[in-house]
Amino acid sequence: MKIAIICITALLLAGTIAAQEGVEISVRTLPPSVVRTVPPAGDTEVSPSLKEIRVTFSKEMKTEKQWSWCLYSADTWPEMDVDKIHYLNDKRTCVAPVRLQAGKTYAIWINTQTYTNFRDRENNPAVPYLLVFQTRK
């Protein structure tokens, strides 16, 4: 309950500050957020033969080599072919080719407070998102 109150208070404060600064609050001006991942966050039965991780955002993104797939820990990072990361034609979905191991937990930051290269066309950085999943044995 305390966390929900803090979050609501922070949102109200942010909205008040934005309104005071004359910033229009709209889909265009607010940051993009993750709306879907493949595999889904929290999935504990991901096939180790999965060849790519996909993250879909709420808005069209800058797509020219613009992303921040970030390390949570060395133990939870998948083998990723960074030279082949790309966006789909929808300009919202970024695809990272990976090699996964069976029976392993993976955790990957999609943007962080420091690394913010996932950005929309208005240059707003995406809200950081932690993708965690586990492959089956």
Describe every region a protein language model picked out.
Residues M1-I5:
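Positively charged n-region of N-terminal signal peptides that target proteins for export
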Residues I6-A14:
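Bacterial N-terminal signal peptides
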Residues T16-A19:
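Sec/Tat signal peptide C-region and signal peptidase I cleavage site
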Residues E21-K137:
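Acidic, low-complexity Ser/Thr/Gly/Pro-rich repeat segments typical of extracellular/periplasmic
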